[in-house]
């Protein structure tokens, strides 16, 4: 039997040989972070068997044992890998099975003669403080005899600081209701939602989308997504009253999960504010929709409703102690043609919310120049225009259209996911957004999809764009390799911040930042020009760790 240990950035495909540049026998980590590596295995080339059942045993030192998780790597089909412009970047541009799902170790493990399989091992000490030293993890597979491989981890005497920026991956609880067949606001809804929220926070997603009304996102005009509405609305003519019991429950759940920032869902429809989101209300004892696609988003009826809601909502958020950690949306991804409508709605919202707490995904800098937004969330392919204009508060985002920037598509090299942390640090980006933590719908939410059967939203987007967790048994999330790597990117950013804090003891913060960029050879790196080679990124992180402890 063959066994190879590899970095977390390797891809163990069932129909490809291993890339030796990812082979890794040892690594180093800080005392309070997560460190992952992989072990791949297959039968010897001269083995006469096609496949055989094997035993798997991992010997873990006592110091690491409470924090070490071993998962079997499973595969998800991808029928739409990348756009033609980025196919050359991929080591598997064809449709096929892609390693992503991290399952519990099965009762029976199979080894094959013609296919590599693997396990993913994580020492997850982010809520601990490991004792510095060198530890050896021994991986054993038993066939007719036992085959072993060792991996050494050196824990260095240094720690990561707390994550400094808000990070959101949009959190779609209607998709959880659909998959698990539970009703909104049921006991099961809250249990499952909290499980997924805890997973989000654990992996660096410290801001959660808060559905005050059903988020008007990725919904066909005239269509509806399942109602998820935290505010109860009571209508009496043109007067409204509100109940915040569900909202309070949401905030308590978020606090238990460790959420730090709250992203109030969009108050106007996507792509330009033309309509109101779906709002359900009780009127004369009947629960019904009162606003939606047939409602002018900046007409007097809907704005009059918001004039009554927003003061009460803000008072409630202040009572809950979270208003200063709340961010508000107008409309997602408005274009220049929609600027007039966006202007009306943005100016309206600014009567109630400070401009620095209003943020939207957009890439047209004229919205900023004309004073319509102070906190733009910019597509990574457009960020440098905003940097050149010296915009003080820039967030970044990527989605299906960003294949030549950092992204997490299944068919892109894992390094293209991992390098994000270096870029966020170098360019002082204040926050990061991605649209799909767990979006299990098709294009425009016309259908529900099974994420285990389709990674592409039913063929709509490149595989991996719409979600980074899978719905597991008993309402628990199943983590993806891509989410593990995304967390590593955020840890890289935090390690650089720790190094900057160290250097700042002897020089200004600005000079320390410049010194680090130069010392690491990152002067030429931009959001569009980068080295995402996995071996390079692993070695670069080790260099950062050594600089921290020298």
Q: Where do the protein language model's features map onto the residues?
A:
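Aromatic-lined carbohydrate-binding surfaces of glycoside hydrolases
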Residues: 90, 94, 123-125, 136-141, ...
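Aromatic- and acid-rich polysaccharide-binding/catalytic face
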Residues: 288-289, 359-383, 395-397
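Catalytic domains of carbohydrate-active enzymes that cleave complex glycans
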Residues: 276, 294-302, 306-337, 348-362, ...
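Short solvent-exposed strand-capping/beta-turn motif centered on an Asx-Ser/Thr pair
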Residues: 32, 42-48, 126-128, 142-144
């Amino acid at each position: 039997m063959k066994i190879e240990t590899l970095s977390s950035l390797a891809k163990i495909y069932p129909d490809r040989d291993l890339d030796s540049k990812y082979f890794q026998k040892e690594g180093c980590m800080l005392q309070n972070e997560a460190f992952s590596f992989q072990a791949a295995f297959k039968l010897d080339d001269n083995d006469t068997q096609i496949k055989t059942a094997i035993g798997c045993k991992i010997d873990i030192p006592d110091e690491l044992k409470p924090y070490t998780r071993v998962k079997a790597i499973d595969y998800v089909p991808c029928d739409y890998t990348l756009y033609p412009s980025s196919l050359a970047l991929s080591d598997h541009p064809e449709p096929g099975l892609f390693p992503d799902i991290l399952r519990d170790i099965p009762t029976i493990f199979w080894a094959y003669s013609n296919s590599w399989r693997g396990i993913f091992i994580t020492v997850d000490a982010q809520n601990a403080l490991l004792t510095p030293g060198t530890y050896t993890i021994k991986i054993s597979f038993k066939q007719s005899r036992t085959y072993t491989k060792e991996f050494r981890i050196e824990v260095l005497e240094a720690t990561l600081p707390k994550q400094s920026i808000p990070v959101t991956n949009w959190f779609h609880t209607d998709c959880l209701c659909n998959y698990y067949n539970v009703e909104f606001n049921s006991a099961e809804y809250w249990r499952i939602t909290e499980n997924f929220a805890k997973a989000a926070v654990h992996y660096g997603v410290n801001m959660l989308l808060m559905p005050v009304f059903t988020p008007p996102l990725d919904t066909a005009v005239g269509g509806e997504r399942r109602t998820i509405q935290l505010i109860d609305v009571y209508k009496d003519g043109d007067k409204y009253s509100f109940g915040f019991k569900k909202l309070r429950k949401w905030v308590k759940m978020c606090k238990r999960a460790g959420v730090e920032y709250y992203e109030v869902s969009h108050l106007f429809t996507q792509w330009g504010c033309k309509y109101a989101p779906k709002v359900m209300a009780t009127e004369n004892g009947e629960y019904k929709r009162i606003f939606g696609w047939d409602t002018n988003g900046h007409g007097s009826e809907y704005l009059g409703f918001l004039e009554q809601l927003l003061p009460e909502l803000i008072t409630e958020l202040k009572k809950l102690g979270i208003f200063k950690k709340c961010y508000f949306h107008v409309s997602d991804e408005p274009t220049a043609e929609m600027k007039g409508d966006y202007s009306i709605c943005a100016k309206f919202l600014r009567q109630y919310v400070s401009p620095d707490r209003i943020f939207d995904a957009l890439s047209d800098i004229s919205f900023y120049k004309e004073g319509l937004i102070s906190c733009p969330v910019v597509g990574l392919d457009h960020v440098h225009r905003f940097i050149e204009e010296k915009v003080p508060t820039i967030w970044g985002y990527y989605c299906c259209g960003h294949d030549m920037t950092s992204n997490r598509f299944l068919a892109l090299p894992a390094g293209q996911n991992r390098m994000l942390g270096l870029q966020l640090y170098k360019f002082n980006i204040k926050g990061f957004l991605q649209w799909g933590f767990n979006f299990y719908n098709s294009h425009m939410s016309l259908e529900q999809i099974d994420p285990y059967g389709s990674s592409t939203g039913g063929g709509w987007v490149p595989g991996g764009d719409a979600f980074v967790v899978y719905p597991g048994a008993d309402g628990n999330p199943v983590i993806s390799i891509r989410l593990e790597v995304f967390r590593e990117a955020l840890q890289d950013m935090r390690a650089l911040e720790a190094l900057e804090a160290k250097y700042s003891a002897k020089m200004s913060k600005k000079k320390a930042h410049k010194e680090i960029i130069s010392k690491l050879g990152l002067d030429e790196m931009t959001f569009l020009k980068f080295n995402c080679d996995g071996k390079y990124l692993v070695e670069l992180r080790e260099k950062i760790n050594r600089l921290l402890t020298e």
